[in-house]
Amino acid sequence: MVTDVGEVDDKSFNQSAWEGVKGFAQQAGTFAVPTSADYIETQDAKDYATNIGLFAESGCDGIVTEGFALGEATLAAAAKYPDVKFIGVDQWQAEAVPNVAGLIFPEDQAGFLAGALAASMSKTGIIAAVLGTDLVPPVVAFGEGYVNGAKHVDPDIKVIKT
């Protein structure tokens, strides 16, 4: 797996993806499919393509790239290494690419449910959401869903987002 910029144990997107990759490797091993997992922590966005290439050149059959920011580098690597399978987490491809599977999650729906729950539990009519940066589309979608879910339960609720 190639992480987005940051560490694999970031308690966020990189870590969630890595835990999924490790889980897959363990499960595949129970079916007598020899599978191993490793990661490269990306230190700078300019290194996405290089890091993906390191795994592709080492003979990996499949590479997971974590985050929407790796989308272009993933597609470029897929074209350069057609025998390697790629999974792009939070990546959407406008055109189908045979060796790329993009995983998109409905963050707005998860946010809606969280906001609805928070509003239904509020005793003051005020709830809050602590979100990450507004530069990350999935975080924005979750936040919008949160507000919509809260307002669905209580149209007058005050929602504080940070």
Residue ranges and their predicted role:
Residues M1-T162:
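A residue-level marker of the well-folded mature domains of exported/periplasmic proteins
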